Amino acid sequence: MKRSVPDLMNASEPLVMVTAYDYPGARHAEAAGVDLILVGDSLGNVVLGYDSTAPVTLDDMIHHARAVRRGAPNTFLVVDLPFGTYHTGVTDAMRNAVRVIQQTGADAVKLEGATPEVLDVVGVLARNGIPVMGHVGLMPQTATAQGGLKVQGRDEASARRTLEGALALEAAGAFSVVLEAIPARLARLITERLHVPTIGIGAGVHCRGQVLVYHDLLGLYEGDEKKLAKRYAELGKEAREAIAAYAREVRAREFPTKDQSFVMKDDVLGKLY
């Protein structure tokens, strides 16, 4: 049975979240029993081939989220609001969030940062019944302004900014906060200070949940190993080897065999000559 926001906030075990971007990935995640699925704007990197998440559009997110919902009808679904969809004012943000919920069947939206403008958006969405997941630490949508894709919160100013941002997101109405690429001790402090669940990615074991990117945990891209992710399979290698085996058999006329071919009666064939 799909969990509700109160279920997630009161969970006694660590929450398990994984990204999915399409129907088969969503089916895998739901069958595995995860608590939440995130349709992340990371699809720009791992699915669409962009070098950042910035080019991802709202239409991209809706297209992929609809497929994910069809594959996982019984799992709590969170959809990222991509860059630019909540940065031009509360009215635009509300319109875009409503569109995501209506057109995808998502249960919540996620956005990055804790600036006063973002906090206003979180508050308006939450007060109007749209659950919001926050995100502090490394924020891929604005990573250039943070000095690139690197660990945040290592010095006092950055650590304090991350802590205060998480607290502000909770106060604004976020039901959960993602902590990305921050020291484990800082993540533990934030988790202890918040009443809503923290979900970590590269933030240590003391968060109240964890999230990994589907392609990272399955090893779909050979050689693309990240410190904040663990590979639980090497499907990229298996896929490459399988396609190479198929190519060899085709070129050697070993595929298809009789097992993959259909028959025709001799008398029917004879009438065609």
Swiss-Prot record:
<feature type="binding site">
    <location>
        <position position="41"/>
    </location>
    <ligand>
        <name>Mg(2+)</name>
    </ligand>
</feature>
<dbReference type="GO" id="GO:0015940">
    <property type="term" value="P:pantothenate biosynthetic process"/>
</dbReference>
<keyword id="KW-0460">Magnesium</keyword>
<keyword id="KW-0963">Cytoplasm</keyword>
<dbReference type="InterPro" id="IPR040442">
    <property type="entry name" value="Pyrv_kinase-like_dom_sf"/>
</dbReference>
<protein>
    <recommendedName>
        <fullName>3-methyl-2-oxobutanoate hydroxymethyltransferase</fullName>
        <ecNumber>2.1.2.11</ecNumber>
    </recommendedName>
</protein>
<keyword id="KW-0566">Pantothenate biosynthesis</keyword>
<keyword id="KW-0808">Transferase</keyword>
<feature type="binding site">
    <location>
        <position position="80"/>
    </location>
    <ligand>
        <name>3-methyl-2-oxobutanoate</name>
    </ligand>
</feature>
<dbReference type="InterPro" id="IPR003700">
    <property type="entry name" value="Pantoate_hydroxy_MeTrfase"/>
</dbReference>
<comment type="subunit">
    <text>Homodecamer; pentamer of dimers.</text>
</comment>
<keyword id="KW-0479">Metal-binding</keyword>
<dbReference type="InterPro" id="IPR015813">
    <property type="entry name" value="Pyrv/PenolPyrv_kinase-like_dom"/>
</dbReference>
<comment type="similarity">
    <text>Belongs to the PanB family.</text>
</comment>
<comment type="pathway">
    <text>Cofactor biosynthesis; (R)-pantothenate biosynthesis; (R)-pantoate from 3-methyl-2-oxobutanoate: step 1/2.</text>
</comment>
<dbReference type="Pfam" id="PF02548">
    <property type="entry name" value="Pantoate_transf"/>
</dbReference>
<comment type="function">
    <text>Catalyzes the reversible reaction in which hydroxymethyl group from 5,10-methylenetetrahydrofolate is transferred onto alpha-ketoisovalerate to form ketopantoate.</text>
</comment>
<feature type="binding site">
    <location>
        <begin position="41"/>
        <end position="42"/>
    </location>
    <ligand>
        <name>3-methyl-2-oxobutanoate</name>
    </ligand>
</feature>
<feature type="binding site">
    <location>
        <position position="112"/>
    </location>
    <ligand>
        <name>Mg(2+)</name>
    </ligand>
</feature>
<dbReference type="GO" id="GO:0003864">
    <property type="term" value="F:3-methyl-2-oxobutanoate hydroxymethyltransferase activity"/>
</dbReference>
<dbReference type="GO" id="GO:0000287">
    <property type="term" value="F:magnesium ion binding"/>
</dbReference>
<feature type="binding site">
    <location>
        <position position="110"/>
    </location>
    <ligand>
        <name>3-methyl-2-oxobutanoate</name>
    </ligand>
</feature>
<dbReference type="GO" id="GO:0005737">
    <property type="term" value="C:cytoplasm"/>
</dbReference>
<feature type="binding site">
    <location>
        <position position="80"/>
    </location>
    <ligand>
        <name>Mg(2+)</name>
    </ligand>
</feature>
<feature type="active site" description="Proton acceptor">
    <location>
        <position position="180"/>
    </location>
</feature>
